[in-house]
Amino acid sequence: MSQTTASITTAQWQQKRDQFVSKGVSNGNRSLAVKGEGAELYDLDGRRFIDFAGAIGTLNVGHSHPKVVEAVKRQAEELIHPGFNVMMYPTYIELAEKLCGIAPGSHEKKAIFLNSGAEAVENAVKIARKYTKRQGVVSFTRGFHGRTNMTMSMTSKVKPYKFGFGPFAPEVYQAPFPYYYQKPAGMSDESYDDMVIQAFNDFFIASVAPETVACVVMEPVQGEGGFIIPSKRFVQHVASFCKEHGIVFVADEIQTGFARTGTYFAIEHFDVVPDLITVSKSLAAGLPLSGVIGRAEMLDAAAPGELGGTYAGSPLGCAAALAVLDIIEEEGLNERSEEIGKIIEDKAYEWKQEFPFIGDIRRLGAMAAIEIVKDPDTREPDKTKAAAIAAYANQNGLLLLTAGINGNIIRFLTPLVISDSLLNEGLSILEAGLRA
């Protein structure tokens, strides 16, 4: 902590924040973070917080992992930023090689690096359009892809992400996506799949012709949309449809990647090989880095100079990402993800017996969520209750986030390095919030 930071109180920092920082930037917790380690954060007043938010899925290897810190320190001492477009450097190339090696599929792959998740999605769209010579972009209802103009256009939730920011990019369409908890009463999952798949097919008759579509962009598990998990059958149908019609199938793995669901990429659970994968968040343990990985012929459709950016694929970010990949392997975080998810799931089902407002429990690996409803029969979303639970947690030492179109989903994005004892301590705080 710097001397300046220590000499100013939390209240004074909060006043400065309100005076000098745009109110358009939200803060889920008004404390001042000064130190993070593993799955714990400490504020300016010395209070400890157990982290179930993970910087919105950015910290799968935890806060300030020693190997990440050492890699970044070493890199900063040697080279901070020559600009890859000016002079290339080894870490960028090494990271591209490693990611191409772990990405699904035996085909030849290439990668590019950028700064943010939204940039990765934008560049996936650019690549798909260049490769197919088509314009149309299809995303899905309840999907979230970023806050730039193109990615806002692809995003489903109007407030707070899109309201008043138009006009939006043309030739962007949103296809139906399954939501099994909210399916029609009495309908089986199989029948519901039939219905949604038919609606997906009809979408390409009523809304946009497939031969005009460059890419379909899908989150294998919808993040901001509420941790909605599609069936293997639905995902495979979408991938097959894309292949049949020459459409680039893009897996948006920005929140789901790097062991969050128990595999490097969530799309692996669905036995589908995407054409392109977008990555960011936990890729570099909190440093700004994103990328697009995919079929070599697609990445090479762009001519030199058509992709990239001033800070894209910085040496510091690439060094951190290489350390992250080592940590995932050395510490078995894919396996640990499933263990964490099971602990959360088991506890959530205990709660469900006691609290009727817990409507649904769902997870893939450690990407877990509980849906808060007003009535288990009507399944009406209860945003107010979910917000109160999250507020209680944040006031009592647990960083916790909500999600979903209706804001009624409690989501778990804890670092995968969390111990069982710390995880259970955090769950105890959450349980107190459920009772409050």
From Swiss-Prot:
Transmembrane segments: none annotated. Its cofactor is pyridoxal 5'-phosphate. CDD domains: OAT_like. The keyword Transferase applies. InterPro entries: 4NH2But_aminotransferase_bac (IPR004632), Aminotrans_3 (IPR005814), Aminotrans_3_PPA_site (IPR049704), Class-III_PLP-dep_AT (IPR050103), PyrdxlP-dep_Trfase (IPR015424), PyrdxlP-dep_Trfase_major (IPR015421), PyrdxlP-dep_Trfase_small (IPR015422). GO terms for molecular function: (S)-3-amino-2-methylpropionate transaminase activity; 4-aminobutyrate:2-oxoglutarate transaminase activity; pyridoxal phosphate binding. The modification N6-(pyridoxal phosphate)lysine is found at residue 281. Its EC number is 2.6.1.19, 2.6.1.22. One of its GO terms (cellular component) is cytosol. One of its GO terms (biological process) is gamma-aminobutyric acid catabolic process. It catalyses: 4-aminobutanoate + 2-oxoglutarate = succinate semialdehyde + L-glutamate; (S)-3-amino-2-methylpropanoate + 2-oxoglutarate = 2-methyl-3-oxopropanoate + L-glutamate. It comes from the Bacteria. Keywords: Aminotransferase, Pyridoxal phosphate, Transferase. Pathway: Amino-acid degradation; 4-aminobutanoate degradation. PANTHER family: AMINOTRANSFERASE CLASS III (PTHR11986), LEUCINE_METHIONINE RACEMASE (PTHR11986:SF58). Belongs to the class-III pyridoxal-phosphate-dependent aminotransferase family. This is Probable 4-aminobutyrate aminotransferase. It comes from Bacillus subtilis (strain 168). The gene is gabT.
